[in-house]
Amino acid sequence: MKRIIFAVSFLFVSFLVKGQASERNFTYVAATGTGIDMNEPSYTPFMVHVLTYYPISKRFSTGIGTGLSFYEVTLIPLFANAKLAITQPRKFTPFVEFGSGYAFAANKNANGGFHLNSSLGVQYALSEKIKLQLSAGYELQKLERLKKSENDYFTAGFAEKLTHHLLSVKVGIVF
């Protein structure tokens, strides 16, 4: 557990470190959100993600992301992301975004699984370097949790495989 906390802390800190170069190529996003679970058992998750993007062109960027996702268990997703601005950047810029990766479980009684998210959103420019971002989309999260049943005569344990299909809403800041 200490290793996981250290790794996540290292990733968060590395996103905040500024380089010595005067030209800034990377874009950073801090976002939070929730979703409506479309399956049973239903669980309303809470997500906090940080992403970093490298611009391939004026409208297309790729990058990586991580964060915390709170389902039945706490998950630490690590994913690759791609973002396409539908129009040229301006005050309101619509975009489409896609990410795929794996979420690691922070609990020893659970295993993470495949993570996928796609969304459609809009960015609102507050200044040259700071933008607000609002998006809605679909998120898929697979995970496995270990369940235990006990009574006076026996103890049984089994792995429960869960797949969450979410309609998600996220709000974030781009800097």
Each predicted region: which residue ranges?
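Bacterial Sec-dependent N-terminal signal peptides
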Residues: M1-R24, V171, F175
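Short, solvent-exposed coil/turn segments
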Residues: E23-N25, P45, L75, K91, ...
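Gram-negative (and chloroplast) outer-membrane scaffold detector with strong preference
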Residues: T34, S42, H49-L132, G172-F175
